[in-house]
Amino acid sequence: QAQNHDDVYDDHFKKEKVDYKKILSPADLIELKQGYEEGIDATIDNNATTKEIRYLAKAYKKSGDKRCITAAENGVVYLLKAQYKNGGWPQFYPDFSNYRSEITYNDNAMINALSVLLDVIEGVNDLDVINEIYISYCNVAIQRGISCILKTQLKQGKQLTAWCAQYDAKTLKPADARTFELKSISGGESVGIVRFLMRLQNPGIEIKKAVTSAVTWFNKVKITGYAYEDIKADNVAGKDRVVIPKPGSTIWARFYDIKNNEPFFCGRDGVKKKTVAEIELERRIGYAWYIQAPEKLLNEDYPAWVAKWINK
Protein backbone atom coordinates (compact mmCIF):
# COMPACT_ATOMS: atom_id res chain seq x y z
CA GLN A 1 0.00 0.00 0.00
CA ALA A 2 1.38 3.41 -0.96
CA GLN A 3 1.84 6.28 1.45
CA ASN A 4 0.52 9.46 -0.14
CA HIS A 5 1.96 12.96 0.05
CA ASP A 6 0.15 13.53 3.34
CA ASP A 7 2.13 10.59 4.78
CA VAL A 8 -1.04 8.68 5.39
CA TYR A 9 -3.05 5.87 3.88
CA ASP A 10 -6.38 5.17 2.25
CA ASP A 11 -8.28 2.01 3.20
CA HIS A 12 -9.52 1.22 -0.33
CA PHE A 13 -7.93 0.46 -3.69
CA LYS A 14 -10.01 0.10 -6.87
CA LYS A 15 -13.11 0.70 -4.71
CA GLU A 16 -12.39 -2.39 -2.61
CA LYS A 17 -10.97 -2.69 0.89
CA VAL A 18 -7.22 -3.09 0.82
CA ASP A 19 -6.00 -6.69 1.02
CA TYR A 20 -2.71 -6.39 2.88
CA LYS A 21 -1.66 -9.91 1.87
CA LYS A 22 -2.18 -9.39 -1.85
CA ILE A 23 0.93 -9.11 -4.02
CA LEU A 24 0.40 -6.14 -6.33
CA SER A 25 1.26 -6.33 -10.01
CA PRO A 26 3.55 -3.67 -11.59
CA ALA A 27 0.43 -2.12 -13.15
CA ASP A 28 -1.31 -2.02 -9.76
CA LEU A 29 1.70 -0.31 -8.19
CA ILE A 30 1.72 2.39 -10.87
CA GLU A 31 -2.02 3.00 -10.49
CA LEU A 32 -1.76 3.01 -6.72
CA LYS A 33 1.03 5.57 -6.62
CA GLN A 34 -0.70 7.83 -9.14
CA GLY A 35 -3.90 7.73 -7.13
CA TYR A 36 -2.12 8.87 -3.99
CA GLU A 37 -0.49 11.97 -5.41
CA GLU A 38 -3.01 14.39 -3.93
CA GLY A 39 -3.79 12.48 -0.74
CA ILE A 40 -7.48 13.36 -0.88
CA ASP A 41 -8.48 9.92 0.40
CA ALA A 42 -6.20 10.05 3.45
CA THR A 43 -8.14 8.56 6.36
CA ILE A 44 -8.13 6.92 9.78
CA ASP A 45 -11.28 4.94 8.91
CA ASN A 46 -11.20 1.14 9.13
CA ASN A 47 -7.82 1.17 10.93
CA ALA A 48 -6.15 2.97 8.02
CA THR A 49 -2.97 4.91 8.91
CA THR A 50 -2.86 3.67 12.51
CA LYS A 51 -2.48 0.09 11.30
CA GLU A 52 0.31 1.09 8.92
CA ILE A 53 2.15 3.07 11.60
CA ARG A 54 2.21 -0.01 13.82
CA TYR A 55 3.22 -2.31 10.98
CA LEU A 56 6.06 -0.04 9.89
CA ALA A 57 7.39 0.35 13.43
CA LYS A 58 7.44 -3.42 13.83
CA ALA A 59 9.10 -3.81 10.41
CA TYR A 60 11.79 -1.31 11.41
CA LYS A 61 12.52 -3.29 14.56
CA LYS A 62 13.01 -6.43 12.50
CA SER A 63 14.83 -4.98 9.49
CA GLY A 64 16.48 -1.76 10.61
CA ASP A 65 15.30 -0.22 7.34
CA LYS A 66 15.19 3.53 8.01
CA ARG A 67 12.51 4.03 5.38
CA CYS A 68 10.12 2.18 7.67
CA ILE A 69 10.71 4.36 10.71
CA THR A 70 10.63 7.54 8.61
CA ALA A 71 7.26 6.54 7.16
CA ALA A 72 5.92 5.58 10.60
CA GLU A 73 6.97 8.92 12.08
CA ASN A 74 5.44 10.75 9.14
CA GLY A 75 2.21 8.92 9.95
CA VAL A 76 2.39 10.11 13.56
CA VAL A 77 2.90 13.67 12.34
CA TYR A 78 -0.19 13.28 10.15
CA LEU A 79 -2.27 12.24 13.16
CA LEU A 80 -1.08 15.30 15.06
CA LYS A 81 -1.88 17.59 12.12
CA ALA A 82 -5.31 16.08 11.54
CA GLN A 83 -6.56 16.66 15.10
CA TYR A 84 -8.97 19.54 15.60
CA LYS A 85 -8.15 22.14 18.25
CA ASN A 86 -11.15 20.87 20.22
CA GLY A 87 -9.44 17.48 20.47
CA GLY A 88 -11.48 15.50 17.96
CA TRP A 89 -10.39 13.82 14.75
CA PRO A 90 -12.22 13.85 11.43
CA GLN A 91 -12.69 10.58 9.62
CA PHE A 92 -10.76 11.98 6.64
CA TYR A 93 -8.13 14.71 6.43
CA PRO A 94 -7.80 16.95 4.46
CA ASP A 95 -11.04 15.96 2.68
CA PHE A 96 -13.87 17.52 4.69
CA SER A 97 -16.71 16.75 2.26
CA ASN A 98 -20.03 15.41 3.55
CA TYR A 99 -19.71 13.60 6.89
CA ARG A 100 -15.94 13.13 6.54
CA SER A 101 -15.34 16.29 8.58
CA GLU A 102 -17.26 15.02 11.60
CA ILE A 103 -15.49 14.02 14.79
CA THR A 104 -15.51 10.28 14.29
CA TYR A 105 -15.66 7.60 16.96
CA ASN A 106 -17.27 5.29 14.40
CA ASP A 107 -15.32 2.05 13.92
CA ASN A 108 -12.97 3.32 16.66
CA ALA A 109 -11.33 5.84 14.30
CA MET A 110 -10.52 8.51 16.89
CA ILE A 111 -9.71 5.95 19.59
CA ASN A 112 -7.25 4.21 17.26
CA ALA A 113 -5.48 7.54 16.70
CA LEU A 114 -5.35 8.29 20.43
CA SER A 115 -4.09 4.79 21.18
CA VAL A 116 -1.17 5.18 18.78
CA LEU A 117 -0.18 8.49 20.36
CA LEU A 118 -0.49 7.06 23.87
CA ASP A 119 1.68 4.10 22.84
CA VAL A 120 4.30 6.56 21.58
CA ILE A 121 4.25 8.35 24.94
CA GLU A 122 4.48 5.12 26.92
CA GLY A 123 6.92 3.45 24.53
CA VAL A 124 4.85 0.29 24.21
CA ASN A 125 3.45 -1.96 21.46
CA ASP A 126 6.56 -1.47 19.28
CA LEU A 127 6.17 2.32 19.18
CA ASP A 128 9.18 2.84 21.44
CA VAL A 129 11.15 3.28 18.20
CA ILE A 130 9.37 6.57 17.42
CA ASN A 131 11.68 9.53 18.05
CA GLU A 132 11.27 11.03 21.52
CA ILE A 133 10.87 14.52 20.05
CA TYR A 134 7.25 13.64 19.28
CA ILE A 135 6.31 12.73 22.86
CA SER A 136 5.53 16.27 24.02
CA TYR A 137 3.29 16.83 20.99
CA CYS A 138 1.55 13.53 21.61
CA ASN A 139 0.95 14.53 25.24
CA VAL A 140 -0.83 17.70 24.15
CA ALA A 141 -2.91 15.75 21.63
CA ILE A 142 -3.90 13.17 24.24
CA GLN A 143 -5.09 15.84 26.69
CA ARG A 144 -7.11 17.51 23.95
CA GLY A 145 -8.58 14.17 22.97
CA ILE A 146 -9.61 13.36 26.53
CA SER A 147 -11.25 16.77 26.82
CA CYS A 148 -13.22 16.11 23.64
CA ILE A 149 -14.33 12.70 24.89
CA LEU A 150 -15.60 14.16 28.15
CA LYS A 151 -17.40 17.02 26.39
CA THR A 152 -19.16 14.70 23.95
CA GLN A 153 -20.49 12.17 26.45
CA LEU A 154 -24.26 12.36 26.10
CA LYS A 155 -26.69 13.11 28.91
CA GLN A 156 -30.28 12.15 29.62
CA GLY A 157 -31.36 14.85 32.00
CA LYS A 158 -28.45 15.13 34.43
CA GLN A 159 -27.32 11.54 33.93
CA LEU A 160 -24.29 10.84 31.72
CA THR A 161 -24.78 7.93 29.32
CA ALA A 162 -22.37 7.06 26.49
CA TRP A 163 -21.40 8.47 23.08
CA CYS A 164 -22.68 8.98 19.56
CA ALA A 165 -20.56 7.55 16.74
CA GLN A 166 -19.93 10.98 15.24
CA TYR A 167 -20.29 14.67 16.15
CA ASP A 168 -20.41 18.00 14.38
CA ALA A 169 -16.85 19.32 14.45
CA LYS A 170 -17.91 22.84 15.44
CA THR A 171 -20.90 22.41 17.76
CA LEU A 172 -19.90 19.03 19.28
CA LYS A 173 -23.50 17.92 18.87
CA PRO A 174 -24.37 14.37 17.70
CA ALA A 175 -24.47 14.08 13.92
CA ASP A 176 -25.68 11.69 11.22
CA ALA A 177 -23.22 9.90 8.94
CA ARG A 178 -24.43 7.59 6.18
CA THR A 179 -28.19 7.38 5.62
CA PHE A 180 -28.44 4.27 7.79
CA GLU A 181 -26.19 5.72 10.51
CA LEU A 182 -28.36 8.29 12.26
CA LYS A 183 -27.38 10.14 15.42
CA SER A 184 -27.78 7.87 18.42
CA ILE A 185 -26.12 6.54 21.55
CA SER A 186 -23.75 3.90 20.27
CA GLY A 187 -23.71 0.49 21.88
CA GLY A 188 -20.56 -0.31 19.93
CA GLU A 189 -18.19 2.63 19.65
CA SER A 190 -18.78 3.58 23.28
CA VAL A 191 -16.97 0.38 24.30
CA GLY A 192 -13.72 1.49 22.70
CA ILE A 193 -14.01 4.93 24.28
CA VAL A 194 -14.49 3.48 27.76
CA ARG A 195 -11.57 1.09 27.29
CA PHE A 196 -9.33 3.99 26.30
CA LEU A 197 -10.37 6.00 29.36
CA MET A 198 -9.74 2.98 31.59
CA ARG A 199 -6.23 2.72 30.20
CA LEU A 200 -5.28 6.15 31.54
CA GLN A 201 -3.09 6.20 34.62
CA ASN A 202 -4.25 7.93 37.81
CA PRO A 203 -7.66 8.93 36.41
CA GLY A 204 -9.25 12.05 37.85
CA ILE A 205 -12.81 12.51 39.05
CA GLU A 206 -14.18 13.42 35.60
CA ILE A 207 -12.71 10.34 33.94
CA LYS A 208 -13.92 8.06 36.72
CA LYS A 209 -17.41 9.52 36.43
CA ALA A 210 -17.39 9.13 32.64
CA VAL A 211 -16.44 5.47 32.90
CA THR A 212 -18.82 4.51 35.69
CA SER A 213 -21.70 6.37 34.04
CA ALA A 214 -21.15 4.63 30.72
CA VAL A 215 -21.01 1.23 32.41
CA THR A 216 -24.27 2.03 34.23
CA TRP A 217 -25.82 2.85 30.86
CA PHE A 218 -24.54 -0.38 29.26
CA ASN A 219 -26.13 -2.38 32.05
CA LYS A 220 -29.37 -0.45 31.69
CA VAL A 221 -29.80 -1.07 27.95
CA LYS A 222 -28.53 -4.65 27.64
CA ILE A 223 -30.88 -7.16 26.03
CA THR A 224 -30.78 -10.50 27.80
CA GLY A 225 -32.01 -13.88 26.60
CA TYR A 226 -31.55 -13.13 22.89
CA ALA A 227 -28.91 -13.58 20.18
CA TYR A 228 -28.39 -12.11 16.71
CA GLU A 229 -27.52 -14.87 14.26
CA ASP A 230 -27.34 -15.80 10.59
CA ILE A 231 -29.84 -18.34 9.30
CA LYS A 232 -30.38 -19.99 5.92
CA ALA A 233 -33.15 -18.32 3.95
CA ASP A 234 -34.90 -18.64 0.61
CA ASN A 235 -33.78 -15.30 -0.83
CA VAL A 236 -31.17 -13.93 -3.24
CA ALA A 237 -28.51 -13.96 -0.52
CA GLY A 238 -29.35 -17.45 0.69
CA LYS A 239 -29.34 -16.21 4.27
CA ASP A 240 -30.89 -13.78 6.69
CA ARG A 241 -29.89 -12.32 10.03
CA VAL A 242 -32.41 -12.46 12.83
CA VAL A 243 -32.90 -11.98 16.56
CA ILE A 244 -33.73 -15.28 18.26
CA PRO A 245 -34.39 -16.31 21.87
CA LYS A 246 -31.25 -17.76 23.48
CA PRO A 247 -31.03 -18.31 27.24
CA GLY A 248 -27.83 -16.96 28.76
CA SER A 249 -27.04 -14.70 25.80
CA THR A 250 -26.73 -10.92 26.08
CA ILE A 251 -26.65 -8.46 23.20
CA TRP A 252 -26.67 -4.70 22.71
CA ALA A 253 -28.10 -2.69 19.84
CA ARG A 254 -25.70 -0.67 17.73
CA PHE A 255 -28.00 2.37 17.85
CA TYR A 256 -30.11 3.63 20.76
CA ASP A 257 -32.42 6.63 20.69
CA ILE A 258 -30.67 9.53 22.43
CA LYS A 259 -33.74 10.47 24.48
CA ASN A 260 -35.33 7.17 25.48
CA ASN A 261 -32.74 4.41 24.86
CA GLU A 262 -34.99 2.53 22.43
CA PRO A 263 -33.01 0.51 19.85
CA PHE A 264 -33.62 1.56 16.26
CA PHE A 265 -32.57 0.49 12.78
CA CYS A 266 -32.31 2.16 9.37
CA GLY A 267 -32.15 1.07 5.79
CA ARG A 268 -30.65 3.14 3.04
CA ASP A 269 -33.83 5.24 2.99
CA GLY A 270 -32.78 6.78 6.32
CA VAL A 271 -36.12 6.06 7.99
CA LYS A 272 -36.02 4.80 11.58
CA LYS A 273 -37.51 1.36 12.19
CA LYS A 274 -38.21 -0.34 15.51
CA THR A 275 -37.00 -3.79 14.44
CA VAL A 276 -34.19 -5.00 12.22
CA ALA A 277 -36.70 -7.15 10.33
CA GLU A 278 -38.26 -3.99 8.89
CA ILE A 279 -35.20 -2.88 6.90
CA GLU A 280 -34.13 -4.24 3.52
CA LEU A 281 -32.23 -7.53 3.28
CA GLU A 282 -29.03 -5.93 1.95
CA ARG A 283 -28.65 -3.75 5.03
CA ARG A 284 -30.03 -6.38 7.37
CA ILE A 285 -27.21 -8.81 6.57
CA GLY A 286 -24.63 -6.16 5.73
CA TYR A 287 -24.29 -4.32 9.03
CA ALA A 288 -23.70 -5.19 12.69
CA TRP A 289 -27.03 -4.12 14.16
CA TYR A 290 -26.52 -6.01 17.39
CA ILE A 291 -23.23 -6.64 19.15
CA GLN A 292 -21.73 -8.37 22.19
CA ALA A 293 -18.67 -6.14 22.60
CA PRO A 294 -19.80 -4.60 25.93
CA GLU A 295 -19.96 -8.02 27.60
CA LYS A 296 -16.23 -8.46 28.27
CA LEU A 297 -15.98 -4.80 29.25
CA LEU A 298 -18.63 -5.24 31.94
CA ASN A 299 -17.66 -8.69 33.17
CA GLU A 300 -13.86 -8.47 33.14
CA ASP A 301 -12.29 -5.13 32.23
CA TYR A 302 -14.44 -2.84 34.34
CA PRO A 303 -14.22 -4.88 37.58
CA ALA A 304 -10.42 -4.94 37.24
CA TRP A 305 -10.38 -1.17 36.70
CA VAL A 306 -12.62 -0.59 39.72
CA ALA A 307 -10.34 -2.72 41.88
CA LYS A 308 -7.31 -0.73 40.72
CA TRP A 309 -8.62 2.85 40.77
CA ILE A 310 -11.87 3.01 42.76
CA ASN A 311 -11.49 0.52 45.59
CA LYS A 312 -7.78 0.97 46.16
Predicted regions and their residues:
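Low-complexity, Ser/Thr/Pro/Gly-enriched N-terminal "stalk/linker" regions
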Residues: 1-39, 156-157, 280-312
